[in-house]
Amino acid sequence: MATVSGRRRKRKIQLSKLFTLTGAKACFKPDHSKIGRSGFSRVVFCNQPDSPEAESRNYCDNYVRTTKYTLATFLPKSLFEQFRRVANFYFLVVGILSFTPLAPYTAVSAIVPLTFVILATMFKEGVEDWRRKQQDIEVNNRKVRVHRGNGNFDLREWKTLRVGDILKVEKNEFFPADLVLLSSSYEDAVCYVETMNLDGETNLKLKQGLEVTLSLREELNFRDFEAFIKCEDPNANLYSFVGTMDLKGEKYPLSPQQLLLRGSKLRNTDYIYGVVIFTGPDTKVVQNSTDPPSKRSMIERKMDKIIYLMFLMVFSLAFFGSVLFGIWTRDDFQNGVMERWYLKPDDSSIFFDPKRAPMAAIYHFLTALMLNSYFIPISLYVSIEIVKVLQSIFINQDIHMYYEEADKPAHARTSNLNEELGQVGTILSDKTGTLTCNSMEFIKCSIAGTAYGRGVTEVEMAMDKRKGSALVNQSNGNSTEDAVAAEPAVKGFNFRDERIMDGNWVTETHADVIQKFFQLLAVCHTVIPEVDEDTGKISYEAESPDEAAFVIAARELGFEFFTRTQTTISVRELDLVTGERVERLYSVLNVLEFSSSKKRMSVIVQDQDGKLLLLCKGADSVMFERLSESGRKYEKETRDHVNEYADAGLRTLILAYRELDENEYEVFTERISEAKNSVSADREALIDEVTEKIEKNLVLLGATAVEDKLQNGVPDCINKLAQAGIKIWVLTGDKMETAINIGFACSLLRRDMKQIIINLETPEIQQLEKSGEKDAIAALKENVLHQITSGKAQLKASGGNAKAFALIIDGKSLAYALEEDMKGIFLELAIGCASVICCRSSPKQKALVTRLVKTGSGQTTLAIGDGANDVGMLQEADIGVGISGVEGMQAVMSSDIAIAQFRYLERLLLVHGHWCYRRISKMICYFFYKNITFGFTLFLYEAYTSFSATPAYNDWYLSLYSVFFTSLPVICLGIFDQDVSAPFCLKFPVLYQEGVQNLLFSWRRILSWMFHGFCSAIIIFFLCKTSLESQAFNHEGKTAGRDILGGTMYTCVVWVVSLQMVLTISYFTLIQHVVVWGSVVIWYLFLMVYGSLPIRMSTDAYMVFLEALAPAPSYWITTLFVVLSTMMPYFIFSAIQMRFFPMSHGTVQLLRYEDQCSNSGNFEMGRQGSVRPTLVMRSHQPES
């Protein structure tokens, strides 16, 4: 009877799903209540895309466009983008006004600089969009085989595909649209899919078509094929799909198991047939391609405020001048005669009419706005964009951040945040795969209450060092360092214990439990074996490194998983009775997948004896409560071992199983099928509810312990970042004991730190939590508040010495701490500690903590992670850094900057961050300095001429100042300048605090640069005016006019701003010499060439240099005297600052030049908490 029923059951589950639960059958009554309603209204006419019903649906075509512009929209849309910037819009208004009689200069000279800047930016946008267009053309013109009718398949371009088309996709081809899988080259319609382009995961996914479409394996089979698919509307969820297929009058449920997404690739399968259900913009990959969160750096936001301040100043000066002009114009008419007779207006002009002084003042206000526009640096935005792009290239090309082993360089995915890298105050880091390698090694296990495995972990080594002892590796007598440094012979397996290796487990007291333990490891997984055709060796494609480590461990200990079909798993193992190796076949009935909410996975299998087994593995927090009363025999010993493993920094899982009777399984099958057939958005919740009822009453087998080793250089990197004054938070899903010990191993925690631990894991609290009553929840919250308050009291009692404290909090406590009424006090405590570790954190909690730190502390936050569960945290932080590690590329694709190893963060921040912050800060300050120096000389000259709105300079002098004579040096400053070299940045991390405290872009520093510009303009104007106004300019006795005074002042301005650039630059390259001195040379060449043009073109600059300025000694003497006088205040200020108020970089520069840096003891940098890091020159300290 058992045999008959077993056969019946085998036939029934012949095509059950591997990655989902048991396949649904048409014999069950499905719930189609949602189909046809909002969100579930799509109807696909399979193999009938030309039918009137299909065409009436008006589904979009399959052309995918990633460009920002089209040919028709490029000009208006790009112009709109440019003139959204207030500065550009202001210059546009000024350009329009320059065509009116109000303009103090010609319209062409006003339009040319704006046109140059706008065209340069549009050119950059156009080139970038053209590259995207070329990529679009390449993708849309790819070809795929499409059913044309009568069983014939022809090649067609992707862009021509329509909903309902039947496609044949062959091995290693990408899917051109979202398809429902019908059949494949395998008899059971299985295919393997690589989804790296979607979620970054490199492991293969297994998909399978419905049983009813298995026979469609030949092209001719589609000649008469017709079906209807009703499914959900287009959406961005990659991991869900709800629909039904109506075929021959029967309805069959569709799930993600049948969905093949555009952008994924067919692997290890000769071909598949599928029907198009979503095209072009409706495909899930395009639905997911939304713009990432817009992030702007702190400096960029502050720069906008400076622009508004400059506008206020421009309007104030224009208003001030207009009022005075109106008063002087009104008072100009005395006794019927105009005092300034030469300004007498004609009948058509009121600009200087004393009888209409108010109107003249209003017109003058508009004229003054145009004249004062030179205070605003027109090329600021485009120059910064150019600089940031080139800075990003330098980051990408840094050989010191290139990970040769994986061939992965650093990649700045956006250039908007370069300077933000130099201002990070808090780093929030994931642990697994970020601080650690995410390359798991099976190192210990507990079976039947007995601990196995004699290896020594990195955490144990760190504990030894803290205790000052020398632990010896028990397995071979080597020292701890040797044990950790030794590479395992088999990747993923670092287990040493002769009691169960080499088949010795059969002699152990609990050999039967050991056998079940490793059988579970060999069977309970979703791993795909791959056989090398040349060597015959088996490798494993696993969804996670843990899974691979378990399968490898089972193989190395005698239980080799070697073959998987859709419905079976084959294992070679040692028979406990005969002692011989045998092959055992397990029929896979169901796979209950792992999820972060369940924290476990199970498989239901049938062994060769006909037994139904549920094999389960999961976190201890959920597994122990699911044990039956009779299955807790080894619970106490296993709990103790799990705690010991956690103390050693190991990741643990509990293994358990149970036998199912046939009736129970039949009930489960019926209920799970009903849940699967529920075509609604909450289908997954219904499935979880059913699986919850069968994953219970388990029998404990033991626990696994795998080690995730720290990446190279992590402790040194963290120590260096801490010396730079950066606080580091670790947000991990690990147990508290594991997280604490990893913290010690990576130098996040130190022996002299006092740990403030907040948790809700005590037995009393757990008992209270189980009651679930409102009073109990309130008590839990009150307990967390009490622990936080107590921690703050400890911190206060220590005098606020953050260096002495570390905060460790578990996930349950964190949930309460992040509530609105408690997060403020929690943040105060956390900020007061040097290090923070959040354990058992969910992805949502990681994002919420990041948001709390970013908004609550006011500091720049950087989040770093490597997995999909870190995406929210990366997007929430000011800067998201993705680690291109083992868990795929999803974190990288959501990040702002990608690096291959955590240790590269040290160079990214302390070198590139520091340099970029200094460069951008100095660049912006210098921009405003040079424009104020130039613009204020115009204002002073206008005031000198009774606000007559006459510019001191020729029109083209005005136009070319910002975009030609002074732009290249400041761009080179932003690209090449270094206050100290990279080795010194790393040697003296205190330099980084200049960015964290924003010393170089504070309002004090900005206003001081502006004041310096005003002073320079005043000195230039008055010295030039005084030197030239009351004496003959040359030997012919000619006095200086506007052309000579303007030319002389302009020369002085060019020299002064160029020399100021020389004094601002800390690190000269040949390029900088060329552009700085070349700017001065080009000014003189321009004077000669432009002045030599016909007078109708050169106007008042005609021959001014060759005939007036160059032959006159007074011009050269005045220029020399004025330039030196203008630079003298800056020399004096710099000398005083260097001598009495040196900044950190100045001190390092001084020591470098004095050759004192050869001795590392000259500087002492200690790890700091919340206080500012201090730089101590030991050589300058008096000896005691």
UniProtKB/Swiss-Prot annotation:
Taxonomy, superkingdom: Eukaryota
PROSITE patterns in the record: ATPASE_E1_E2
Any Pfam family the entry gives: PhoLip_ATPase_C
EC number: 7.6.2.1
GO biological process, alphabetically ordered: phospholipid transport
Main localization category: membrane
InterPro entries according to UniProt: ATPase_P-typ_cyto_dom_N, ATPase_P-typ_P_site, ATPase_P-typ_TM_dom_sf, ATPase_P-typ_transduc_dom_A_sf, HAD-like_sf, HAD_sf, P-type_ATPase_IV, P-type_ATPase_N
GO cellular component terms given for this protein: membrane
Listed transmembrane segments: 76-97, 102-124, 307-328, 365-382, 922-941, 956-975, 1006-1028, 1042-1064, 1071-1091, 1109-1133
Disulfide bonds, paired cysteine numbers: none
Entry function: Involved in transport of phospholipids.
Protein name, entry field: Probable phospholipid-transporting ATPase 12
Gene behind the chain: ALA12
